[in-house]
């Protein structure tokens, strides 16, 4: 259908006028709603309009800031059960517990521990060179069947609560199970018919390469477990190469041991947690940091000479002798004695 030109012009004008009228009416409606909003009163029954309200009138309560309270008490715990916040290492004087102690008389071990005063150092052997754990480890290797590992964890927690300084002893590079299951981490036989196979010491244990990534990751996992369990310090014993044997190692032994110690110390030690090393000689270049050097099988007559060979700072604090007698020549340095010695040494204290 054709619409004449004149008719189209009229329709266009009518449409423009209608659109303008709609826009004006919409603007008037919007302004009216905004103006009306000031008179709307909301109640439980709904909304009503009250034209008697003033636009300046405030309804409700004006919020004011709460006055500062001055009657809040602060409790300062300065008693014997207060937790020490000191980050400084102090000289150790305490006792050690072997795996055999716990196997033979676990209840007797616990009874002796109850007599020890807060801040006494207690070292607990929590893993043997075979690879058996004496705490509830999640590494996947065997847990002890001779000792209740959950009871050991409970004992550790009790010592921590009582304020004793608790140290875990773990073989670092001597581990039969881990070596057997991770052949590339172990020291190989150097010559002969079985060259390249895992080397085993006279006690039947495999030894691990100190700088091997698998070895260091395994030790890191163990240390983190022990830290979470509540230990203040972990001693990595057997932190050395075997003294002799037909094994092959092409690296610099001294440099690699130091490198392993520095790596573990840097990644694991904190202001409140120490990583220490059980070494074969006091000449070991112990890295600076929150760590100690532990020496075993040092006769009382050799204490002075052994300590003189150490090149570490604060030797009276960072050098610890694991002794088997009550000889007082050890007391100038850190010393840990068999727990049985506490029957005499703690008497009257």
Q: Where do the language-model regions lie?
A:
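Aromatic-lined carbohydrate-recognition surfaces of secreted/lumenal glycan-active proteins
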Residues: 96, 165-174, 235-237, 255-299, ...
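Substrate-binding cleft of secreted/luminal carbohydrate-active enzymes
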Residues: 32-40, 44-46, 290-349
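N-terminal Lys/Arg-rich, disordered targeting/topogenic segments
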Residues: 1-14
């Amino acid at each position: 259908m054709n619409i004449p030109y004149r008719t189209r012009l009229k329709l266009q004008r009518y449409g423009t006028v209608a659109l303008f009228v709609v826009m004006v009416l919409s603007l008037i409606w919007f302004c009216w709603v905004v103006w009306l909003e000031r008179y709307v009163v909301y109640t439980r029954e709904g909304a009503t309009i009250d034209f008697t309200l003033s636009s300046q009138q405030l309804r409700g309560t004006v919020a004011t800031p709460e006055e500062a309270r001055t009657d809040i008490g602060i409790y300062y715990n300065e008693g014997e059960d207060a937790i020490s916040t000191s980050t400084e290492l102090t000289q150790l004087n305490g006792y050690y517990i072997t795996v055999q102690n716990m196997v033979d008389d676990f209840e007797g071990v616990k009874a002796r521990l109850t007599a020890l005063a807060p801040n006494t150092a207690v070292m607990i052997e929590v893993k043997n060179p075979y690879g058996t754990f004496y705490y509830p480890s999640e590494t996947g290797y065997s847990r002890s069947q001779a000792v209740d590992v959950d009871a050991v964890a409970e004992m550790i927690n009790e010592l921590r609560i009582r304020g004793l300084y608790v140290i875990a002893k773990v073989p670092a590079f001597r581990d039969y199970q881990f070596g057997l299951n991770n052949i590339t981490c172990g020291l190989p036989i150097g010559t002969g018919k079985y060259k390249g196979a895992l080397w085993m010491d006279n006690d039947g244990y495999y030894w691990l390469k100190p700088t091997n990534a698998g070895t260091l990751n395994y030790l890191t996992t163990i240390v983190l477990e022990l830290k979470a369990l509540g230990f203040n310090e972990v001693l990595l014993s057997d932190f050395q190469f075997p003294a002799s044997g037909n094994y092959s190692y092409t690296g610099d032994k001294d440099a690699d041991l130091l490198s392993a110690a520095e790596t573990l110390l840097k990644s694991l030690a904190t202001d409140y947690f120490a990583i220490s090393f059980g070494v074969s000689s006091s000449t070991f270049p112990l890295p600076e940091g929150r760590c100690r050097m532990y020496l075993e099988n040092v006769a009382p007559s050799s204490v002075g000479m052994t300590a003189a060979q150490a090149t570490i700072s604060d030797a009276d604090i960072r050098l610890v002798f694991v002794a088997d007698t009550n000889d007082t020549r050890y007391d100038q340095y850190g010393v840990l004695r068999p727990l049985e010695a506490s029957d005499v040494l703690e008497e009257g204290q």
